[in-house]
Amino acid sequence: MKKHIGISLFFMGCFLSLSATNYFVATNGDDSNAGTLDKPFATLQKAQSKVVPGDTVYIRGGEYRIREEQMMGGDHLRAYVFEMNKSGTQAKRICYTGYQDERPIFNLAEVKPEGKRVSVFYVSGSYLHFRNFEIIKTQVTIREHTQSECIYNQGGN
């Protein structure tokens, strides 16, 4: 009996690990691509539209010059550059990470929404993991509250 449970757990673990997908984003990518290492997406927005719990988005090295028209949303106070609203689970997080030893850099010098705080990564989803990338030149454009955020966590885990 214990042997059958162990074998079942082994195969279930293999099945679960097979269901996770790796997506890739690169400065030379195209959002009509499949999001693979050889044919990466161009934007995090496209990658986020595809991910499900357990998936990983690898961000290739290079400088991503973000433009204001690429912003995903906002409210009366904030402009969201990347609105990260999809959730992983406690057991199957969604990971956004720089690829291997490469260093992706998100340059926000051109994002200057008038009278708003800039939230580069506005995180409203839960069980998301971010690592191994830089965010530079985030602008402060609101006069009443001189604050902008690289990562703003809106109550997620």
Residues covered by each model-derived region:
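Bacterial Sec-dependent N-terminal signal peptides
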Residues: 1-21
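Right-handed parallel beta-helix/beta-solenoid
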Residues: 18-46, 53, 63-65, 100
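Active-site/binding-pocket entry motifs
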Residues: 30-31, 102-104, 112, 136
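Short, solvent-exposed loop/turn segments at secondary-structure boundaries
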Residues: 35-38, 71-72, 110
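Residues at the C-termini of beta-strands that transition into short coil/loop
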Residues: 45, 99-100, 109-110, 155
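Short hydrophobic/charged patches on amphipathic alpha-helices used for structural packing
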Residues: 45-48, 118-119
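Beta-solenoid repeat scaffold
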Residues: 51-106, 122-131
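Right-handed parallel beta-helix
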Residues: 67, 73-75, 112-157
